[in-house]
Amino acid sequence: MELYLDTANVAEVERLAHIFPIAGVTTNPSIIAASKESIWEVLPRLQKAIGDEGILFAQTMSRDAQGMVEEAKRLRDAIPGIVVKIPVTSEGLAAIKILKKEGITTLGTAVYSAAQGLLAALAGAKYVAPYVNRVDAQGGDGIRTVQELQALLEMHAPESMVLAASFKTPRQALDCLLAGCESITLPLDVAQQMLNTPAVESAIEKFEHDWNAAFGTTHL
């Protein structure tokens, strides 16, 4: 199972990389834009924050296949080993096929259906990213989409894997993992919610109170 952070906040990645067992960082154009930094400046800093073994994802902006391929090569040249996110449109599928031949690893993004995700995998995407909460927001069932996509990949494209995205709650993320999802990417607030449970702090304070009452210290 692989856990990613969905952010371009370098300081938070540096902090959380010491806490969470993260495999890397995912970004998208909106996340990069919110950082107010050039993508060519922030990507190297993110890679440094996650280390050489961490996997970094960044997305193309062009709408046509040739433009996507050219931008993917620029990203690869800037960050060797980067995974390039390609929207799963007709042009995107064409780009994924070309990039597969070029040896550039891709993720099929903006996936709203299992069929769409399967096409990305068959075209050559190593990762496929269904948008869990956004599917829910459109009246669909995000977790069901993940389940169906996971089953399809296991049967027809076992070299590809689901990297579920677009979460608003830890429960959504856990349900994806229970559905057999191999990897997820979490926004910072959801990652923090997984750890910051008020009951935990109350339990620790009770332990300290009882220990201090008996031994006059809060240390061993």
UniProtKB/Swiss-Prot annotation:
<protein>
    <recommendedName>
        <fullName>Fructose-6-phosphate aldolase 2</fullName>
        <ecNumber>4.1.2.-</ecNumber>
    </recommendedName>
</protein>
<keyword id="KW-0963">Cytoplasm</keyword>
<dbReference type="GO" id="GO:0097023">
    <property type="term" value="F:fructose 6-phosphate aldolase activity"/>
</dbReference>
<keyword id="KW-0119">Carbohydrate metabolism</keyword>
<dbReference type="InterPro" id="IPR033919">
    <property type="entry name" value="TSA/FSA_arc/bac"/>
</dbReference>
<dbReference type="InterPro" id="IPR004731">
    <property type="entry name" value="Transaldolase_3B/F6P_aldolase"/>
</dbReference>
<comment type="pathway">
    <text>Carbohydrate metabolism; fructose metabolism.</text>
</comment>
<dbReference type="InterPro" id="IPR001585">
    <property type="entry name" value="TAL/FSA"/>
</dbReference>
<comment type="subunit">
    <text>Homodecamer.</text>
</comment>
<dbReference type="InterPro" id="IPR018225">
    <property type="entry name" value="Transaldolase_AS"/>
</dbReference>
<dbReference type="GO" id="GO:0006000">
    <property type="term" value="P:fructose metabolic process"/>
</dbReference>
<dbReference type="InterPro" id="IPR013785">
    <property type="entry name" value="Aldolase_TIM"/>
</dbReference>
<keyword id="KW-0704">Schiff base</keyword>
<feature type="active site" description="Schiff-base intermediate with substrate">
    <location>
        <position position="85"/>
    </location>
</feature>
<comment type="similarity">
    <text>Belongs to the transaldolase family. Type 3A subfamily.</text>
</comment>
<dbReference type="InterPro" id="IPR023001">
    <property type="entry name" value="F6P_aldolase"/>
</dbReference>
<keyword id="KW-0456">Lyase</keyword>
<dbReference type="GO" id="GO:0005737">
    <property type="term" value="C:cytoplasm"/>
</dbReference>
<dbReference type="Pfam" id="PF00923">
    <property type="entry name" value="TAL_FSA"/>
</dbReference>
<comment type="function">
    <text>Catalyzes the reversible formation of fructose 6-phosphate from dihydroxyacetone and D-glyceraldehyde 3-phosphate via an aldolization reaction.</text>
</comment>
